[in-house]
Amino acid sequence: MHEMSLMESVIEIVCETARQNGATRVKSVRLDVGVLSHVNPDALIFCYEAVRHGTVADSATLEINRIAGEGWCLDCGKTVALEERFGACPDCGRHRVQMTAGDELKIRDMEVI
């Protein structure tokens, strides 16, 4: 389960950022997770519960925002919705689509005290 190492990194970044800004506690964390990122949100939540204990994020809430897949078709020049990572353009049917959203995992923001 790669979600555990991902969440360990998220907690490390969150705690270090809180310390650098003089915060004593993290109140909430919001993540953006792309639907095409191969990251399971339920597994992330499970791992979050496991790795936050004993840190300044011990009682922080976690919110996960799902980011839809989107791409730019190099053939028809349109921005299109993507349902799969290497799918065809839904407009022209060609497979020259450059992904522009939906594969990210990033910390959107956090609230500290």
From Swiss-Prot:
Top-level taxonomic group: Bacteria
Function, in words: Involved in the maturation of [NiFe] hydrogenases. Required for nickel insertion into the metal center of the hydrogenase.
InterPro entries in alphabetical order: Hydgase_Ni_incorp_HypA/HybF_CS, HypA/HybF
Positions annotated to bind Zn(2+): 73, 76, 89, 92
PANTHER family: HYDROGENASE MATURATION FACTOR HYPA (PTHR34535:SF3)
UniProt-recorded Gene Ontology molecular function terms: nickel cation binding; zinc ion binding
Family statement drawn from the similarity comment of this UniProt entry: Belongs to the HypA/HybF family.
Binding positions (Ni(2+)): 2
Key words, A-Z: Metal-binding, Nickel, Zinc
Name of the protein described by the UniProt record: Hydrogenase maturation factor HypA
GO biological process, alphabetically ordered: protein maturation; protein modification process
Gene that this polypeptide is encoded by: hypA
